[in-house]
């Protein structure tokens, strides 16, 4: 398997490239609109062709690059089936592996940050990798105060889906704001300042309800745009509309 971790600075978003060397099938997890050209240039340099985009959830802090990537490459757009988005080609759900050539990706239903959020687990005889989306971050976790989020659901998701994994499972989050790249389940279980070190549900709810964070500055257009797989809504700022893409079907 070929693997790359890519970073978009403005929203501090990580995009992940996975490619099956045997079949040539290539996947981008959580691509960002502003970095589509960079991602395609990388694939070209590596001699790869994009076949799939896979979303963890409907993002509020950036516009996805999914639609633009499909327009250019004819790749398939996949994401949680519960989102019920007509613009997606494939709906994924827990219990039904997503197959990329010889790579098996196991979706994990992990609501809490958003109500339909999914993480993706790669496990083989060598190592386990968890693409945790916005549910579990490095020494943190996703917020729960919009998009039908719930601290109770997030606590349950992290404890019942993530913290049962082997301690050496490598965690690759969708965001990091301090220049870190990955963590492990063991570290987050013991050291995560919001949910680690045996914090109780009551303690976690108190922490999450006291965060008092401002809403993401792109939220008003990112959420409706991402419900269209990255098509710019009417209220997108002029400087962003220049990089938006219309689907082939209009």
Predicted regions and their residues:
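Conserved beta-strand hairpin/beta-sheet module of binuclear metal-dependent hydrolase folds
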Residues: 1-49, 120-133, 139
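Active-site metal-binding loops of divalent metal-dependent hydrolases
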Residues: 31, 58, 82-83, 113-114, ...
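A contiguous binding-surface segment within folded domains or other stable secondary-structure elements
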Residues: 105, 114-164
């Amino acid at each position: 398997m070929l693997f790359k971790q890519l970073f978009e600075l403005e929203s501090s978003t990580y995009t992940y490239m996975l490619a099956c060397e045997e079949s040539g099938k290539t996947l981008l997890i959580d691509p960002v609109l502003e970095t589509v050209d960079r991602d395609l240039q990388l694939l070209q340099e590596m001699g790869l062709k994009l076949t799939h985009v896979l979303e963890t959830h409907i993002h509020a802090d950036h516009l996805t690059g999914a639609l633009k990537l499909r327009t250019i490459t004819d790749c398939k757009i996949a994401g949680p089936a519960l989102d019920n988005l007509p613009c997606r080609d494939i709906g994924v759900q827990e219990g039904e592996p997503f197959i990329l050539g010889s790579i098996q990706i196991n979706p994990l239903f992990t609501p809490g940050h958003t109500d339909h959020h999914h993480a993706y687990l790669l496990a083989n005889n060598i190592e386990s990798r968890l693409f945790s989306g916005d549910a579990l971050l490095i020494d943190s976790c996703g917020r729960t105060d919009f998009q039908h989020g719930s601290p109770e659901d997030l606590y349950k998701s992290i404890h019942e889906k993530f913290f049962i994994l082997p301690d050496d499972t490598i965690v690759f989050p969708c965001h990091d704001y301090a220049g870190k790249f990955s963590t492990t389940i063991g570290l987050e279980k013991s050291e995560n300042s919001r949910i680690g070190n045996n914090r109780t549900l009551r303690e976690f709810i108190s922490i999450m309800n006291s965060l008092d964070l401002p809403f993401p500055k792109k939220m008003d257009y990112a959420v409706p745009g991402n419900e269209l797989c990255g098509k710019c809504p009417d209220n997108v700022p002029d400087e962003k509309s220049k990089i938006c893409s219309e689907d082939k079907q209009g």
